[in-house]
């Protein structure tokens, strides 16, 4: 199991939440493979490298400034606007219409990547094949 702290949202990321997660894992005896738990906030240099390539390849674009940061343009993922089908280990074959999503923000600006970008890059780099999340 890979453990990392997804702390790109500074307001909702607190040390006590991390402590609770570590205590819960220790209590259950679930092992995790990362000796030093990586934090997304410490890996922004990695995510920043991918933004220009996504833009150059036509998968993302700079959009009008967001209300939270009116001086810098946000970076949006360019939605493919089609049906996407994939195999889910729990639900079986899942299909959804990406036209319902719109082009979502993946970075507050060229220097501030958000969770939606960071988590995909981390999953790929860390060899994650299965993800379990609460619903």
Give a label for each model feature:
Residues 1-32, 123:
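N-terminal, positively charged nucleic-acid-binding surface of large information/translation enzymes
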